[in-house]
Amino acid sequence: MADYPPAALRLVAALRKLPGIGPRSAERLALHLLSAPPGASDDLAHAVKEAKAQIKPCPECGFFSEEGLCEICRDANRDSTLLCVVEHAPDVLNFERSGAFKGKYHVLGGLLSPLDGIGPEELKIPALLKRTKQNKVREVILGFGTDARGETTALFLAKELAPAGAQITRLATGVAAGSGLEFVDSITL
């Protein structure tokens, strides 16, 4: 039975490592790249290399930046006493797209997971505690999901941040607008 050449199989395997890309999607993407006009795959390879070389975590908050502090941390119009803590850098974009948050962010780089060996030192929690005290933050919004790791991290941070005197706020959870109670699980109720 015939199969793709080894280089094509390596390309499919590399694409499968991307989040949300299964075997069929990886194969389709690989075939597209191999069938694309000359230079198209070079453009993609160059863009990936350039992004990896130029984009680094902001030293203040952990969001994406090309030049030292990110755009958000450099913005003097942002409320530096209002801090939203998120798991990963893309979470910042979700808040930004809402247009509702005018404070600053802190990216932890993950959530606490003792079973996986992820404690406060593996995340940017010490930097968060230091930043909260130094910047006299008055409110910290914990922008995590409600799964076990999100809840564990939120409880831990609430306890650790309490001495700083900042108000600790969680994201709203519950019944979605327009849905009836017959569709809501018992935990939400």
Model-predicted regions and their roles:
Residues 102, 129-189:
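Long C-terminal interaction/binding lobes of large macromolecular proteins
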Residues 2-8, 17, 27-92:
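Cys/His-rich Zn2+-binding cysteine-cluster or related metal-binding knuckle/ribbon modules and their
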Residues 17-19, 171:
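Short conserved micro-motifs on helix faces and helix-strand junctions that flank
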Residues 19, 38, 51, 63, ...:
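Conserved phosphate/pyrophosphate-binding and hydrolysis machinery centered on Walker-type P-loop NTPases
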Residues 9-13, 27-31, 42, 46, ...:
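Solvent-exposed alpha-helical segments within well-ordered globular domains of core cellular machineries
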Residues 26, 75-143, 147:
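Extended interfacial segments that mediate partner engagement and assembly in macromolecular machines
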Residues 57, 69, 91, 108-111, ...:
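Glycine-rich, flexible loop/turn motifs
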